[in-house]
């Protein structure tokens, strides 16, 4: 077993997967967390919540990553927010850190609250290229893996293969790789710079 790192300074990184029930966001978050903490070498906590509806209700899952043991498992200030529908974007955008990254499904989120956003066609790729809307979560997962910089594609694949139904491996891996491709096209450094408190005279 790979030993967990012991460092003097913890670097905490928080990700929230959000959308509606039935989009597979909790599964995506679990795969992401296990890729980081089980197959990777960092500490990780994964939590989730969802509405009483089986499908269509609110759904969110959080992953907290650190180089040191995590003292509080809930996200406090998000480094990255994935919003897979408009309601999630509206509800959780203000939980982002000023320099945090908003990632949305461009097919389902039309009203963007900031120009510092990555909008990618997760649902359209899943539907039109792979033939199953249900794997939009895996397309998004691939992009999040790249954009977060917290996990390798290899470890995402390893984690994914332990969590998906037998017989769906090729479809899900294809979806993951398409997300990786889309995420790799994005240069975060070219996004608008966030406004910080130092930008204002008080």
Where is each model-derived feature located?
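Active-site cofactor/cluster-binding pocket
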Residues: 2-202
